[in-house]
Amino acid sequence: SATREALSALKAMGLVEMKQGEGTFVKQFEAEQLIFPLSIAILMNKQDISHLLEVRKIIETGTAASAANNRNTEDLAIMAEALEEMKQAGPSDEELGEKADLKFHLALSAASRNPILSTLLDQVSELMVETMRETRRIWFFSKQTTIEKLYQEHLQIYQAIVEKDEEKARKTMISHIENVENILKKYFHEAIDKQ
């Protein structure tokens, strides 16, 4: 229901706490803790996120394969820099981690040398940032994965592109996006069960 989805969005933002058998309670917070834009509430609809992840699978798997064929040393340097920033950010600097994550995906897009793919990715990049942010928050706070696992997934994509292995690039990208999808589905399932 719409109420459950709204409560799930508020929970993900850290604004409410759900206690099984007791109810939903507004948490005390400082203004600086409210780090998510209001648009995240729109994305907290399970179906919307599912659709966005499907779009990402379609666009980014092809982008990764194309990048493996068309990348140059400058592209690899930007991807490597994004990976290093991601590694340095760790769980302590969420904002840097998010920026590095997006930088990596946009570098893949540029490496494809396909302006239409790049434009499509740019069109969904704002929504991607929101789901990346949400996924990172869920991952880190639910202990369902670690920053190292997220880094390793990106590193595998990068290595496939370095090797110019189109099929491996496609497979590692789809694996990464499916892992994101599974974590978000599990989160939504748990959030609904607790209500």
What are these regions (language model features)?
Residues S1-I59, A65, N69, I192-Q195:
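Short linear motifs at protein or domain termini
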Residues D93, T145-T146:
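Short coil/turn linker motifs that delimit alpha-helical repeat modules in TPR/alpha-solenoid proteins
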Residues S175, Y187-E190, Q195:
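Conserved mid-sequence domains
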